[in-house]
């Protein structure tokens, strides 16, 4: 096979991405199983799900900590899931979550500026329903 290569990329926020180019068998026409374009997406996707979402989870946690009616329960990629009691105004909770999430650029800049300037607006979408399959309303 072909010799393996390794490399790494450090994002502006300090996150280190390591990648490995595996040996390819001789019969594979001297191709490797790693495409250099794969690493190009790491900083973009990593900024969203590796930096911004965890930062904002902390802000959301601080805002809802101790509230038994609003429980932060999970994340899936860039989605954040809450379990909200039927006893509270869901629209009010949704607006609060949306407002907090749309402040992500300000929060990000307060932590990383002047090293990194995040000057793009982020729009957050909030949906709710009894289950994922029943989510219909959007803010």
Where are the regions a protein language model picked out?
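Conserved catalytic core of nucleotide polymerization and phosphodiester-bond processing enzymes
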Residues: 1-139
């Amino acid at each position: 096979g072909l010799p393996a290569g390794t490399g790494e990329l450090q994002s502006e926020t300090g996150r280190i991405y390591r990648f490995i180019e595996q040996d390819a068998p001789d019969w594979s026409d001297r191709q490797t199983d790693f495409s250099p374009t794969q690493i190009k997406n790491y900083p973009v996707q990593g900024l969203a799900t590796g930096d911004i979402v965890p930062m904002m989870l902390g802000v959301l946690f601080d805002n809802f900590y101790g509230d038994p009616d609003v429980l932060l329960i999970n994340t899936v990629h860039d989605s954040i899931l809450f379990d909200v009691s039927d006893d509270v105004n869901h629209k009010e909770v949704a607006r609060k979550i949306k407002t907090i999430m749309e402040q992500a650029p300000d929060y990000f800049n307060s932590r990383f500026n002047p090293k990194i300037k995040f000057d793009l607006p982020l729009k957050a979408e909030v949906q709710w329903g009894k289950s994922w399959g029943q989510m219909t309303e959007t803010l």
